[in-house]
């Protein structure tokens, strides 16, 4: 269902939109590339009649992000066709916007230098235009600011911003059992099946001075996919997940660098609440590294 009508892709309309997009900064293009690498698509599929159906777009449950893209590119905002997950469960309502024609070619040209995961898709997309002279662009040569803009978009698409609250079972000096609610802890995770991207992000963040706790691996087994009781029901091997993790006071400097670029209200709210937690007591570990004590050091800013 169309919620907001955009400009039809004609040569005249595309040229008008492109003239406006030329005023956008490199950092905005890097941020957009992060979103496209995360939850976007760059498609060169053909129609059943053999015609090219080139499209660049994004599909999410966060309407404000899709609406921002739609307003920026003057495209239509629609709800995605209702479908079911492969495991048979219903999806949440998703919103989608896509761009085609000369407008899409220009957008692809602008985000291509900043893409990390979908570089081959972008090259294939541009090569599908017969008159397009493909140019070599530097790969993964972002400045620190460009990388942070890309990383912010990618993290809003693929990352998790949490404040963890843990209840622990403890015993006091009298031997009595009681429930102890530990102070909240900031936790950031970036999860993807592509190990090389996760490790690249870790290396780049550490070079910029951020402390990344670890990159973990979640081994995934076989599971059932498809609606129960149908012919589509099958057993598949899920890909392993790779997880970049920061917590506590280590996550907060990263949040401060990401916040100026962020546009997803749901995640902005979580980041602002996380930055309102103050870690103040320090201690030395047996390895000589300085860490923040979590359980006894969090106070709330008034």
Mark where each language-model region is.
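Internal intein/HINT superfamily modules and their associated LAGLIDADG
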Residues: 1-302
């Amino acid at each position: 269902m169309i919620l907001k009508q955009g400009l039809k892709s004609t040569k005249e309309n595309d040229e008008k939109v492109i003239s406006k997009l030329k005023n956008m900064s490199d950092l905005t293009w890097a941020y957009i590339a992060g979103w496209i690498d995360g939850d976007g698509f760059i498609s060169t599929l053909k129609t059943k009649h053999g015609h090219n159906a080139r499209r660049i777009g994004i599909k999410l449950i966060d309407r404000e992000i899709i609406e921002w893209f739609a307003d920026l590119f003057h495209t239509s905002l629609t709800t995605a066709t209702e479908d079911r997950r492969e495991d048979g469960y219903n999806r949440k309502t998703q919103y989608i916007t896509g761009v085609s024609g000369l407008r899409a070619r220009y957008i692809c040209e602008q985000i291509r230098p900043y893409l990390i995961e979908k570089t081959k898709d972008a090259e294939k997309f541009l090569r599908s235009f017969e008159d397009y002279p493909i140019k070599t662009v530097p790969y993964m040569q972002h400045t620190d600011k460009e990388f942070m803009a890309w990383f912010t978009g990618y993290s809003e698409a693929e990352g998790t911003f949490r404040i963890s609250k843990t209840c622990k079972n403890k015993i006091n000096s009298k031997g009595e059992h009681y429930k102890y609610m530990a102070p909240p802890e900031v936790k950031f995770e970036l999860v993807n099946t592509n190990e090389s991207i996760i490790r690249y992000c870790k290396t780049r963040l550490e070079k910029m001075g951020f402390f990344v706790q670890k990159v973990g691996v979640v081994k995934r087994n076989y599971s059932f996919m498809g609606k129960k009781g149908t012919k589509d029901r099958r057993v598949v091997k899920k890909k392993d997940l790779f997880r970049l993790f920061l917590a506590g006071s280590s996550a907060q400097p990263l949040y401060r660098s990401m916040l100026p670029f962020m546009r997803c209200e749901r995640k902005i709210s979580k980041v602002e609440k996380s930055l309102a937690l103050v870690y103040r007591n320090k201690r030395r570990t047996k390895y000589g590294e300085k860490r923040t004590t979590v359980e006894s050091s969090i106070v709330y800013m008034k």
